[in-house]
Amino acid sequence: WVFGNPYFGSWGHKYQIPKEQLENIQNSKYIFLSHGHPDHIDPDSFDIFKNKTLILADHYGDRIYNALKKNYNCLKLKNNTWLEISKNIRIKAFADWNQDSALIIEIFKKNILFHLNDGQALGWSKTIKDLIKSYDNRFLLKLINWGDADMINFYNNNHFILPLAANKSPCGESYNYYMKKWNCNYAIPFSSMHSYIREDSIKMNEFTTPLNLHYENFNQKDGNLLPAFIRWNCEKNDFSEINPKKNIEEIRTALDFGDNWSDELESSDERDLNDYFQKFYHLKKKFGFINFRIGNKDFNIKLSNRKEGIKIETPRNSLIFAIKNNIFDDILIGNFAKFELINVPSLYPDFNPYVAKYGDNGNARSKNELKQYFDYYKLNSVNYWIDFLRIKTEEIIRTKLTNYKKIYSIARLVRRKL
């Protein structure tokens, strides 16, 4: 994401990209695309792709690869396979079952950059840990913040529910935890330099993490948490800071991006919405309905006779664009849409992954498609069952404690100190 405003104009860059760094991007021979979120692969940045090799992980469905290979030089890298891109640099990619991917970058045989981005390296955790630990300098690049980069705009009877991010838990403790988990001795604030610029999402800036607070409660016994913007000298093991200027973002209206909160659904929109959500087999097992409040009218989609449901209030234009282009996650992360959960504690694990990740990105919606999808990752992920059992255990605990945010925060802190 170099140019543009992802998530239907909701996000902007918090910092300017200096001219020198922009030239470095434009002069690079390779670009790694980790996943499909527009803050990682924004259409307004596509001109940069010309005359470059785009590297992608080996995902089920190959959605991004198939879309881009028509116009760009794309290289699909097999999992856990070294690719030498210069005399002193080689890389490995790892695809996980959430349609995220991680990248290992080896420099001079002694430095490792572990580019985890927004993911968890599901199915590859032990393999990656064992690989990283033998290097001198091990850098962790991972999304760590208070937790705004997901749908947090939840309501209960028109009253906004404070998200977990409102606790503003010290990020330094999270850096310590993840550095220890991944055997890294350096970390850099990463994948968190955005702000909200749409008039209907700017309130979420309260929950974005100021750069200085990334270092709060960080314990240097586990390594070094470096400044966010640096040039690292691999020969001298030293760095210099870049110090980019902060952007002063102009607040944009929803209309600037084609959204009018007064627009109502047309009959064809209702058919498209119903067709889109009825394809998801798993939703029918877990939810009874999804109700859309668009303009001044409600449109209800019945999925089953269950009592669990979701109410969504959002502008028509971006919603219809999202379902027609299979990018519903952009509605969630934009945080201008309002969500209300009925008899269900969270969008995880039964809505978000099945719609946005396995469905939209993996093209797996029916019972049979989901089986093929997970069979693929079972066969192509060395540590699948280790990570699967860990994730399922965490989901059970998180679901039980969702209504007790303080207890959940304390439990998470205790777990990370063990």
Task: List the model feature ranges, each with a label.
Residues 232-418:
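Feature captures hydrophobic
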Residues 57-111, 216:
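Metallo-beta-lactamase
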Residues 17-81:
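Active-site HxH/HxHxD metal-binding segment of metal-dependent hydrolases
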Residues 126-221:
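Cap/insert and terminal regions of metallo-dependent hydrolase folds
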